Each structure stands twice: as structure tokens, then as C-alpha cells.
Amino acid sequence: MTNIRKTHPLIKIVNHSFIDLPAPSNISAWWNFGSLLGLCLAIQILTGLFLAMHYTSDTMTAFSSVTHICRDVNYGWLIRYMHANGASMFFICLFLHVGRGLYYGSYIYFETWNIGVILLFVVMATAFMGYVLPWGQMSFWGATVITNLLSAIPYIGAXXVEWIWGGFSVDKATLTRFFAFHFILPFIIAALTMVHLLFLHETGSNNPLGLVSDSDKVPFHPYYTIKDILGVLLLILALMTLILFSPDLLGDPDNYTPANPLSTPPHIKPEWYFLFAYAILRSIPNKLGGVLALAFSILILMLFPLLHLSKQRSMMFRPLSQCVFWILVADLFTLTWIGGQPVEYPFIVIGQLASILYFTIILLILPTASLIENKLLKW
């Protein structure tokens, strides 16, 4: 009798994706983040579902309902903090996953890469809308500031902002629609993830050497299932340590104050994972210019397949490009730090320099380094 795993229409799909999938024999721990992102998404959908059972999306009761979840619901505090800190873990895994793709040239599979960039955008939109839901001070003012950016669009800007708000300011209509979108988007993310994997499995995984690995494949199970389980355990350990020891480490104290349209917090800033983009936005004095720079700071990822001028795929044997890559990483850390600082003398200049460096490295220095390496290798 033929194995049901290989004949049943549904189980066959799972088999070809997670069991009998041919995988390169040398992929490192940097390839674990895909499965960890899947785990993060599952955690977020499950905890989010239980939070939605107790949350009310009304301006009068939203803040109280979150308090109620933390105080009165059985293990509500745990579910709430798993959801909030799960988002941080999600973004840590996302940034490492994208960084791995940049370092090892995974963007050469451009369908997989571009769907990944779209996924990044959708996850960022979901996280932003989720941050508005507790209706604290930073929720309200964050929503006001970020939605207001659309007013920079010529001619239709002002009308578009009021359309998104559902009124003349961030209010009940805004909160309700953000809750609706925040609920539906994770399922859209899950669907896009399937497409992401579909395209990946058309070509097979890249590997650290950036070479074709068809001659040396191993089955995904048991080799990479056991490896993924180790990653999963480490992620859960890190997440639970964060939740149980310092759940508010990455949050903003202002969000424990109920939203008040009449009092603006001294420093409006988003969650830590948006700070690098926020710093780029703030470093340009012109509103429209800032918004364009903000959008382009993520969209620029889609240009990587076009900017790849090296004859080698991976950076593993390209010391010059490696050096530039790590400068880019340091620059992103600098931008993240600047995004959380007030807009005053030293920070403004540092932010502007870091923003210029970010775009210069990607558009100019990395391609130039690739050409120099080609020349040095007489290629």
C-alpha cells in the first residue's frame, strides 16, 4: 500500500512542504527565522483572538476593557503581554530574516523577495493599527501623527486623511475601523505567507555559499524539523523571559494614561521597531519629502535584485561588501536610537547624516563595492 502521506491530496501538500522537501545540506541557523516567523504569526493570531473576546472598540471603554483583561480575565495579563511582546519578537525575527536575505543574496529569487517585502509592509500596517487599540496617550497621538502624514499628498491629501479618520479627528470611527482591519490583516498575512512559500518551493532554498545545491540535498524532515524545534524553544524561552520579568521594557509609559485629545505628550514616538523609519521621516524638514523618504526606506528593498552587480550571489566570500553590510546594520541601529530621541541639536544632525548614509550605502556604496570585488577577482 502506498503511504497516505504521498497520495492524500491535502496531506501530500504538507508532505511536499515540510517532510520530503529537498533542502540544501548546509543552511545555517540564519535559515531558522522563516519557521520562527510562522510561530510568531500563530502566537499573535491565537492571543489576539482571545483578546478580541474581551476587548471593546469604543473610545469610552477601550482603555477600560484592556485594564479589565489584565485584572479580571483569567491569565488575561499573560495573553495581553504575550500579544504585545510577541509583536516585538515578530519584528526581531523579521529584521533578522530580511538581513539574512540581504547578506546571502536571497533576493535573487525576486518573486519570493517581493512578496516578502509586501508582507513586511502589511505586518507594519497591522502592528501600527494594533498599537492604536489600547487607546492610551501614545496610541491616540501616534494614530494622529501617522495618519496625518497622508495630508502631504498633493490635492487629495486632506480629503484622504478625513476619509481614513471617518471624521475630522481620530475618534470612535477611527478606532472601530482600525480594530476591524487589525483583526482581518493577520489572516491576509497568513495567505501571503503561503504564496511566499509557494514561490520559494519553486526554486528551493538559497544557502550560505550562494551556490546551486541541487547535487547535495537532504530531506527537510528530520534534519530541519529538529533544527526548527530548537529555534522554536529558544524563541519561546526569550519571549516568556521578557513577559514574566519585564513585560513593559519595550512599551511606552505614556500608554498607561488614557487618551486625551487636549494634552499632547512631550515626545510622540512609535514602538521601537518603527523608530528607524521614524528617524528617516523626521530628518527631512519638508513634509512630503519626509513621507516619500519613509515609504522609500522600505520600498528600496525591492530594488536589491536590480542593484546586485556582483558575479557572486552570497557575501560569504566578499569581504568588502561584508564590511559595507555591517556599516549599514550599524547605521540602522543609529537610526533606531535617534528615532527615540527628542528633536534637538545633536540628534537632528546625527539623524540626517544616518539617513543620507542609509540610502547612499544601498544605492551607491554596495553596488560599487561589488564592482570593485569583481575587478579584483579579474571577473
Curated annotation (Swiss-Prot):
The keyword Cell wall biogenesis/degradation does not apply. It is found in: Mitochondrion inner membrane. Keywords: Electron transport, Heme, Iron, Membrane, Metal-binding, Mitochondrion, Mitochondrion inner membrane, Respiratory chain, Transmembrane, Transmembrane helix, Transport, Ubiquinone. Pfam families: Cytochrom_B_C, Cytochrome_B. GO terms for cellular component: mitochondrial inner membrane; respiratory chain complex III. Disulfide bonds: none annotated. A ubiquinone binds at residue 201. It is a multi-pass membrane protein. Its cofactor is heme b. Heme b b562 binds at residues 83, 182. Binds 2 heme b groups non-covalently. One of its GO terms (biological process) is mitochondrial electron transport, ubiquinol to cytochrome c. Heme b b566 binds at residues 97, 196. The chain crosses the membrane at residues 33-53, 77-98, 113-133, 178-198, 226-246, 288-308, 320-340, 347-367. GO terms for molecular function: metal ion binding; ubiquinol-cytochrome-c reductase activity. Belongs to the cytochrome b family. PANTHER family: CYTOCHROME B. Heme 1 (or BL or b562) is low-potential and absorbs at about 562 nm, and heme 2 (or BH or b566) is high-potential and absorbs at about 566 nm. The cytochrome bc1 complex contains 11 subunits: 3 respiratory subunits (MT-CYB, CYC1 and UQCRFS1), 2 core proteins (UQCRC1 and UQCRC2) and 6 low-molecular weight proteins (UQCRH/QCR6, UQCRB/QCR7, UQCRQ/QCR8, UQCR10/QCR9, UQCR11/QCR10 and a cleavage product of UQCRFS1). This cytochrome bc1 complex then forms a dimer. Component of the ubiquinol-cytochrome c reductase complex (complex III or cytochrome b-c1 complex) that is part of the mitochondrial respiratory chain. The b-c1 complex mediates electron transfer from ubiquinol to cytochrome c. Contributes to the generation of a proton gradient across the mitochondrial membrane that is then used for ATP synthesis. This is Cytochrome b. It comes from Urocitellus parryii.
